[in-house]
């Protein structure tokens, strides 16, 4: 397609949101009008399914749950007065709590103001808050935030050691819907121990975000924590950023949360329009479907050309892959759906993997995210008439052109600035796109059975570890792995048994391995004191 035809295609498919100042360009995706026509019935059904979801239908049939994250920024559309009241009151409680912390009405036991936050959560309870913090937190926030988003002991120590000098003025937020998420529970216990060792009462620094009546809620209530905020069963972790999960940490950092909610609400209104060409989420869903033939055949590369949006690709990775990566469709047929997502930031990635994108396997489509405003204030000219921001813009446009010349498809999403309004809109845009695409390919985008399978396998391995230690404590002499596996009645799990014991031995945990490390089948195992 020549330059004139491309310009006409750009004009035909360009979307612009006047209140948000957001542009969406899908002209470099290679679909035609005939292809769009074939999808018209599927889009009509997807629009109807989305309307039913917002009206309170059971949109997560596997867990028999409603899906209500859209109600969070428009309580008036919640299906009951009770839900509407709960949403409004929770937002007010978040704002009141943050204001009291900022003004010292809620303060550390030893006086003064809280200076830091440790946020303990995993998955959606971490990725959204991390993305929003990096993109929107002021340079000097009222509280600095630190995240414990894994059960890695070394990683936990790094965060706690960094905060140690200010532990007495640190607020801790524990985020877990059930209260039983092992990684979050482990983080909570590690932090609690550090507070105890410092002579501090953990409860006087702790806040819970959890579901009503959960294990975590019971712990927080009985210990007298500072506050408990709700996690609703109709909000999934990966769509929870505009619930208490994301709004409380944001408010404590001084981020205007109502502006985020307003941006999301404006985008929700735009993406409710049941017309493909004037609905930005539908345009994105169409592009995804076209790129991967509705089967996820191509990866999604996300390149924000703005440092403050660097974590957006990680946030999208969970939102897209956990929602759409499904073995079966809604009728139980095996389909193996999904879209792989990766990315970092431009122009950094132009010096990393863009070489392969242009000249290697054509197994992807790319989303450029452009921000029009370079910075607050004027820029230095690095060449006559040219600024650093001009280079950033020029490199984006150049990469887009270079990829298109090699038959590589791309989408360009343009924001006027990175603000609470546009970040809220960005979150809402992709939440809706994932929902529409899920309906197009007929999968449940709101559950995650694969994650649960991994949790069950991990629990079984830890139970096996306890059994191994018990048997070894009764053995007077070293025994072989095969013998030990037979004694626990699991000869088929010899490899797992070896890997568990190797980890215990490396950490001095009551086990020693004798023999050549490169030949595990010849090792002898014994208990140590």
From Swiss-Prot:
It catalyses: alpha-D-glucose 6-phosphate = beta-D-fructose 6-phosphate. Its main location: cytoplasm. The gene is pgi. One of its GO terms (molecular function) is glucose-6-phosphate isomerase activity. Catalyzes the reversible isomerization of glucose-6-phosphate to fructose-6-phosphate. This is Glucose-6-phosphate isomerase. The active site is at residues 322, 351, 455. The keyword Phosphoprotein does not apply. HAMAP family: G6P_isomerase (MF_00473). It comes from Cyanothece sp. (strain PCC 7425 / ATCC 29141). Belongs to the GPI family. The keyword Isomerase applies. It is found in: Cytoplasm. Its EC number is 5.3.1.9. GO terms for cellular component: cytosol. InterPro entries: G6P_Isomerase (IPR001672), Phosphoglucose_isomerase_CS (IPR018189), SIS_dom_sf (IPR046348), SIS_PGI_1 (IPR035476), SIS_PGI_2 (IPR035482).
């Amino acid at each position: 397609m020549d330059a004139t035809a491309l310009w006409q295609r750009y004009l035909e498919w360009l979307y612009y949101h006047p209140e948000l100042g957001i542009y969406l360009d899908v002209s470099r995706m290679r679909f035609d009008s005939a292809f769009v026509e074939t999808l018209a019935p599927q889009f009509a059904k997807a629009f109807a399914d989305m309307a039913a979801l917002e009206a309170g239908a059971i949109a997560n049939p596997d867990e028999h749950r409603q899906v209500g994250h859209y109600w969070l920024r428009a309580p008036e559309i919640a299906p009951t007065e009770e839900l509407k009241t709960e949403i409004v009151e929770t937002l007010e409680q978040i704002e009141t709590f943050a204001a009291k912390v900022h003004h010292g009405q809620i303060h550390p036991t030893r006086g003064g103001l809280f200076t830091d936050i440790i946020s303990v959560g995993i998955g959606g309870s971490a990725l959204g808050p991390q993305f929003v913090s990096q993109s929107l937190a002021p340079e000097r926030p009222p509280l600095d935030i630190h995240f414990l988003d894994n059960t890695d002991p070394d990683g936990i120590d790094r965060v706690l050691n960094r905060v140690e000098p200010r532990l007495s003025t640190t607020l801790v937020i524990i985020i877990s819907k059930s209260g039983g998420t092992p990684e979050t529970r482990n983080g909570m216990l590690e932090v609690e121990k550090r507070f105890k060792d410092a002579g501090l009462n953990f409860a006087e620094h702790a806040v819970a975000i959890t579901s009503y009546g959960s294990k975590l809620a019971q712990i927080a209530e009985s210990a007298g924590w500072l506050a408990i905020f709700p996690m609703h069963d109709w909000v999934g972790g990966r769509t929870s950023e505009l619930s208490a999960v994301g709004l409380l940490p944001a408010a404590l950092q001084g981020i205007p949360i109502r502006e985020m909610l307003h941006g999301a609400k404006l985008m929700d209104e735009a993406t409710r329009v049941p017309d493909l060409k004037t609905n930005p989420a539908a345009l994105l869903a169409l592009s995804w479907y076209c790129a991967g033939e509705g089967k996820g055949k191509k990866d999604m590369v996300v390149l924000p050309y703005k440092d403050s949006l660097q974590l957006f690709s990680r946030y999208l990775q969970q939102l897209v892959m956990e929602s759409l990566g499904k073995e079966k469709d809604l009728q139980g047929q095996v389909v193996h759906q999904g879209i792989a997502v990766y990315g970092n930031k431009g122009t950094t990635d132009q010096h990393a993997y863009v070489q392969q994108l242009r000249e290697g396997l054509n197994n992807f489509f790319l989303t450029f995210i452009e921000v029009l405003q370079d910075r607050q204030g004027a820029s230095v000219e690095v060449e006559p008439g040219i600024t650093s921001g001009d280079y950033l813009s020029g490199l984006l446009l150049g990469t887009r052109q270079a990829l298109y010349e090699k038959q590589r498809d791309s989408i360009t999403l343009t924001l006027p600035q990175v603000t609470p309004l546009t970040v809220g809109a960005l979150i809402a845009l992709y939440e809706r796109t994932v929902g529409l695409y899920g309906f197009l390919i007929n999968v449940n985008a709101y559950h995650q059975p694969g994650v649960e399978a991994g949790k069950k396998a991990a629990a079984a391995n830890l139970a096996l570890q306890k059994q191994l230690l018990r048997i070894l404590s009764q053995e007077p002499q070293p025994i072989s792995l095969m013998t030990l596996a037979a004694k626990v009645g699991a000869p088929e799990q010899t490899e797992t048994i070896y890997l568990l014991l190797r980890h215990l031995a490396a950490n001095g945990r009551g086990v020693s391995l004798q023999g050549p490390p490169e030949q595990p089948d010849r090792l002898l195992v014994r208990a140590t004191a």
